[in-house]
Amino acid sequence: VKQSASQKELLGRAAVNYAESIYLAEDYLRSRGIPLEVARLAQLGVVARPEIGHEAFQGRLSIPYITKTGAVDLRFRSLNPAVEPKYMGMTGADTKMYNVLDIDKANDYIGVCEGELDTITLSACVGIPCVGVPGANSWKKHYTRLLADFERIFVFADGDQPGTEFARSLARELPVTIVQLPEGEDVNSAYVKFGVGYIREKAGLE
């Protein structure tokens, strides 16, 4: 669905507004091993003063999907594990690939994983250029074309059945190397528990 200029402007304004309050999520981000400066680079924010129509996202982490033309989507994550749903999106918004700017920054290899915070972890904390999708069932055919020129594509498979199935489905589309994470772990939890070297070694980059 093509966005109007006013929709894009609204998304951009909301992203900037929420980014000003990212300090409110400092403790949460620290628990995920993500420094505040990394969160700022990713333009993460907190919905402290909701834009009109965003009242349902009050208090959530805002995650903008940034392209060369600016913010094209916003997703919102609960900062309180007791609050469901964990993730919320804009009404009527289609799922998109996250962190597409890394496609241009990457050289001969790129990572693919589930989840925005896992993507930030790989890209900014581990040093592996990475794109992400919101969940295992969110892959689209045109994403395959976006990654077709890379010599190596690492798919980081969460340590659960959907994660394994996600990696296998991508292996049918692209020549990927599957990096299988331990049972019950995703990229971010493995990074927090085992460190940068562990993840790079799992990918064969050490």
Language-model segment annotations:
Residues 1-62, 67-68, 104-105, 204-206:
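TOPRIM metal-binding catalytic domain and adjacent DNA-binding surface shared by DnaG-type primases
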Residues 49-151, 166-167:
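Phosphate-handling DNA/RNA-contact segment within nucleic-acid enzymes
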Residues 60, 145-150, 188-200:
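Short, surface-exposed amphipathic charged segments that create phosphate/polyanion-binding patches used
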Residues 106, 178-182, 197-206:
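A charged alpha-helical hairpin associated with nucleic-acid processing machineries
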Residues 112, 150-162, 180:
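Acidic beta-strand-to-loop metal/phosphate-binding motif
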Residues 133-139, 158-161, 181-184:
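Short, acidic/turn-prone active-site loops that include or flank metal/cofactor-
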Residues 165-174:
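Short, aromatic/basic amphipathic alpha-helical patches
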